[in-house]
Amino acid sequence: MSTNNSVLVLKVGGALLQCEMGMARLMDTAAAMLANGQKVLMVHGGGCLVDEQLAANGMETVKLEGLRVTPPEQMPIIAGALAGTSNKILQGAATKAGIVSVGMSLADGNTVSAKIKDERLGLVGEVTPKDGTYLKFILEQGWMPICSSIAMMDDGQMLNVNADQAATALAKLVGGKLVLLSDVSGVLDGKGQLIHSLNGKQIADLVKQGVIEKGMKVKVEAALEVAQWMGQAVQVASWRDASQLIALAKGEAVGTQIQP
């Protein structure tokens, strides 16, 4: 991949944080891209760590339509797990791979506007792009921002944002190419086979059939939103698959292409 000005927005799932080899492989891929002049922005969740921390504090995890319900009393624990532990674990892996990274959250640099998404979800945020100055400065230095999905409202209230939706807002902000990486190779059909390409109508049909549901529904709808906004395909792929990462580094299509 030659030097270019486009930004590759990599969203990584929380399950990655529990796989040291997967993290090392992904960061090596990112390091190779950065060395080639490709700007890389990483956005992460940390669901597994959040679940562990909540359980350790005697609290339970409740999800509604694939989104984590966030009561006010859970917010400090969720913020600590995402903006703290998860972010620093990924930064540590980046440092080990020789990457200069900047750990940040959606609350930094006036990057996004945040509001309550749905009262039923508690302190769950919906974010829209606001000011790209801070992010663009970091990217122009050849550094890699590693952004957690904790946002802040104008009154200082912290909000928990779904990481796929956070990556969507940041991809729009920097005009980047979005790749949603999880622990599955892409969107699978009812028989567990990889679907290579999907458009809005096909997605709606698969949601109706119950083939795409919960977290994957949130992921695919976030991907479709960016695909339509940018007028280009968004990839849903796996960090577990070394061959997908190599193809990704070469700028090739991997996983499922969500078409505008």
From Swiss-Prot:
Q: Name one GO cellular component term.
A: cytoplasm
Keywords noted in UniProt: Amino-acid biosynthesis, Arginine biosynthesis, ATP-binding, Cytoplasm, Kinase, Nucleotide-binding, Transferase
Where is the site Transition state stabilizer? K11, K219
GO terms (BP aspect):
arginine biosynthetic process via ornithine; L-arginine biosynthetic process
Q: Which reaction(s) are listed as its catalytic activity?
A: N-acetyl-L-glutamate + ATP = N-acetyl-L-glutamyl 5-phosphate + ADP
Name its cellular compartments: Cytoplasm
Q: Which residues bind substrate?
A: G46, G47, R68, N160
- The enzyme's E.C. designation: 2.7.2.8
Enzyme class of the recorded protein, top EC level: transferase
- Entry's InterPro entries? AceGlu_kinase-like_sf (IPR036393), AcgluKinase_fam (IPR004662), ArgB (IPR037528), Asp/Glu/Uridylate_kinase (IPR001048)
Q: Which Gene3D superfamilies match?
A: Acetylglutamate kinase-like (3.40.1160.10)
Pathway it belongs to? Amino-acid biosynthesis; L-arginine biosynthesis; N(2)-acetyl-L-ornithine from L-glutamate: step 2/4
Q: Name one GO molecular function term.
A: ATP binding
Looking up SUPFAM superfamilies in the UniProt record yields:
Carbamate kinase-like (SSF53633)
PANTHER family noted in UniProt: N-ACETYLGLUTAMATE SYNTHASE, N-ACETYLGLUTAMATE SYNTHASE, MITOCHONDRIAL
Q: What does this protein do?
A: Catalyzes the ATP-dependent phosphorylation of N-acetyl-L-glutamate.
* UniProt xrefs under HAMAP family: ArgB
Q: Which family does it belong to?
A: Belongs to the acetylglutamate kinase family. ArgB subfamily.
Q: What is this protein called?
A: Acetylglutamate kinase
